[in-house]
Amino acid sequence: MTSIRQLHQQLVNKEKTAVEIATEFLARIQALEPQVKSFLHLTPDLALAQAQKVDEKIARGESLHLLAGIPIALKDNLCTKGIPTTCASRILENFVPPYESTVTQKLRDLGAVIVGKTNLDEFAMGSSTENSGYHVTANPWDLSRVPGGSSGGSAAAVAAQECVVALGSDTGGSIRQPASFCGVVGLKPTYGLVSRFGLVAYASSLDQIGPFGRTVEDAAILLQAIAGYDPQDSTSLNLPIPDYSQFLKTSLKGLKIGVIKETFGEGLDQVVAEAVNQALAQLKALGATIKEISCPRFRYGLPTYYIIAPSEASANLARYDGVKYGIREDADSLIDMYTKTRAKGFGAEVKRRIMLGTYTLSAGYYDAYYLKAQKVRTLIKEDFDRAFQSVDVLVSPTSPTTAFKAGEKTADPLSMYLSDLMTIPVNLAGLPGLSLPCGFDGQGLPIGLQLVGNVLREDQLFHVAHAYEQATDWHKRQPSFTN
């Protein structure tokens, strides 16, 4: 297993060049992609050009950022100047952004090597990456199963070691749930910590960009690089960003951890519950105090989310009309063109959510649904506020199950929505959440542990996650087919 720090040392010690590292990863992608299908667009020429610049820097004796020369993948809903950005939708199949998102610009400036854009559920709407308008990504642990979603391509690419780290976006669990299914670390930061400028919007009050890595340290290094104030994002927080690496400690003495009672109810697989309980015992052994916490409004998270998120999506997706960018269908009138373009360009799940949102925002139902959902959102946030008065970090399973078979839930949207039961309330409250591997089921599929922190307490999440990771070896296991 190759970490950012290991590759950095190889570069600094001149054991390998950045071009050699990039070439190795590009070859690995070529070998594995026919089966995993993590990517929508590969950027080998860009990767080698970026690697060459890093080698030139080394030759000049200049200091390197930890991410310089590190192969990284980007979810294909992040705008990249001159590189297609499709959001896995047919409506944007010919779209090449004229500008760069803030996070990808930061990575370019630091010398990271971009190997490609990863697959996702169309416009980030889904929990399995099966809603992509192009192809379905496979889970590297079992190619017949889904990698989770919507950032399934990024999670699968990291798990298959097609890149070292990757970026995803999380609106209701879209980083944490695929991290759980693919056995990697995934973090959704506090809302506003990372700029959303250049992230194609799904639900603007919930979306947040975050890192995937195979270790907690790799995720911490990547978050450090992308976090920070951006005047181009009105929701960006103007606060200093700490060095997250300093919080990677191994003792949890004095730390109070709360177990969310409501996440251990009906629908939770027994094997997942057992793995999480064993993880709690390990956290206790590391010095943490464990207590049960009740968040009674947690169970309203799913219905609240499926009113608020589609409402925001129906507004955000109104811009795809065949006029400004994306595909355009031939038609006799403007209305006809809108209708044909959107009917052909959007997939079934996106259409479903647009209709849901348009319905809940309509005059007769606005108060009954949208306004009520916003009030319930406040109550969910209050539950978390109350919990954090007595504990530092909250713990739950990341997802009620391990990865399911491709095609198993596509006919039943409600059963698919339940995959994000544990993750959604964290987005509604704007809190940071991290998923890391805490075991495997009987079929060798990874199980994820979710840690939830108070606002801007990513430091505590990294502390707890790193301590647990160092005391276990789940993160060292690799999918057998990728070796």
UniProtKB/Swiss-Prot annotation:
InterPro entries in UniProt: Amidase, Amidase_CS, Amidase_dom, AS_sf, GatA
GO cellular component: glutamyl-tRNA(Gln) amidotransferase complex
GO molecular function, one term: ATP binding
This protein's record includes keyword Magnesium: no
Record's keyword terms, sorted: ATP-binding, Ligase, Nucleotide-binding, Protein biosynthesis
Catalytic activity: L-glutamyl-tRNA(Gln) + L-glutamine + ATP + H2O = L-glutaminyl-tRNA(Gln) + L-glutamate + ADP + phosphate + H(+)
GO biological process, one term: translation
EC number per UniProt: 6.3.5.7
Domain of life: Bacteria
Transmembrane helix found in the keyword field: no
Catalytic site: 75 (charge relay system), 150 (charge relay system), 174 (acyl-ester intermediate)
Signal sequence residues: none
Role according to the record: Allows the formation of correctly charged Gln-tRNA(Gln) through the transamidation of misacylated Glu-tRNA(Gln) in organisms which lack glutaminyl-tRNA synthetase. The reaction takes place in the presence of glutamine and ATP through an activated gamma-phospho-Glu-tRNA(Gln).
Record family assignment: Belongs to the amidase family. GatA subfamily.
Subunit structure: Heterotrimer of A, B and C subunits.
Entry-linked HAMAP family: GatA
The name this protein goes by in its record: Glutamyl-tRNA(Gln) amidotransferase subunit A
